[in-house]
C-alpha cells in the first residue's frame, strides 16, 4: 500500500483556506514554489475563492487570496515586487494581511527614517537626504 504525503506548502495553504472560511482572515498572502502553483490554484478555484498571482523570484509565486474587495485594493497597491514597495504600500499591505499593527508601525518608521542614509538619527530632516 502506497501512502501519499501532502507537501508542507499545501498543508499551509489548506490551513490558510480554513482560517479564511472561519473568518480569522479576510486576505492571505501565500508564497510557494512554482511547482505547487497548479495544485494551489485548483484548490482555490474548487472552493470559489478569488485570487491574484504575482511572480516572486525565479522559483516562487505569491498567491493572494480572500475577499474580493481586498484583492481589488491589492491589485492597485502591489504593482511591483514586494521588495520595491514604498514604506506606505508596505504598511498598507501588512495591515491588510492582519500583521501586528504595532510591528507594522515600527517597520514603517524604520523604513521611512532609513531612506536618507543617516540611520534614523535625523528625525526626517537629514542634510544627507537624496
Where are these regions (language model features)?
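Domain-length accessory/inserted modules outside core catalytic folds
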Residues: 1-130
Amino acid at each position: 500500500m502506497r501512502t501519499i504525503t501532502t507537501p508542507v506548502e499545501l498543508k499551509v495553504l489548506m490551513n490558510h483556506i480554513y482560517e479564511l472560511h472561519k473568518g480569522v482572515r479576510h486576505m492571505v498572502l501565500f508564497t510557494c514554489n512554482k511547482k505547487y502553483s497548479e495544485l494551489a490554484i485548483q484548490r482555490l478555484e474548487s472552493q470559489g475563492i478569488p485570487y491574484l498571482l504575482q511572480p516572486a523570484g525565479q522559483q516562487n509565486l505569491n498567491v493572494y487570496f480572500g475577499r474580493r474587495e481586498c484583492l481589488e485594493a491589492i491589485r492597485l497597491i502591489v504593482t511591483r515586487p514586494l521588495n520595491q514597495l514604498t514604506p506606505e504600500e508596505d504598511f498598507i499591505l501588512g495591515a491588510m494581511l492582519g500583521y501586528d499593527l504595532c510591528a507594522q508601525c515600527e517597520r514603517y518608521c524604520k523604513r521611512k527614517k532609513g531612506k536618507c542614509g543617516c540611520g534614523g538619527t535625523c528625525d526626517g530632516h537629514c542634510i544627507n537626504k537624496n
